Amino acid sequence: MKTHSNDGNNTNGENGNNSYDVIIIGGGPAGATAGIYTARANLKTLIIDKGLTAGALGITSKIANYPGISGEIGGAELLQIMRDQAQSFGVKFISERVIGVDLLSETKSVFTNTDSFSARAVIIATGSMGRVNRIPGEERLLGRG
């Protein structure tokens, strides 16, 4: 991820539409959980994520051992439950790719392909996707245990 300097040409503007207390990069379990805690602390929170199936949980087809969930559930379905809970506390989610950040200033900036956002704090919760496929046919088994 490249770092940008804040040259004043972003869309944060004076109206504060893109200004938050906390921006969380990554909307998986860690990002959603962080969002729940920050929103419950009355902090205006934005989660920027590439999409519901961008992370390891989102592509997992079956989970049978998650606390509080009886039976089996798909990873994307479990992730949606987490996101719904975060949204119920006021977290805003957007689907974007983060292309850069400026974390050196007191007000932090996060840049996406189409916009920029500012916050007092940035949490990076990008998770993991592991290694790339190395065995022919591996992609058809990905997320199946």
Region roles according to the model:
Residues M1-I25, A41, F93-G145:
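FAD-binding core/adjacent interface of flavoenzyme oxidoreductases
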Residues Y20-F89:
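Beta1-alpha1 glycine-rich phosphate/pyrophosphate-binding loop at the start
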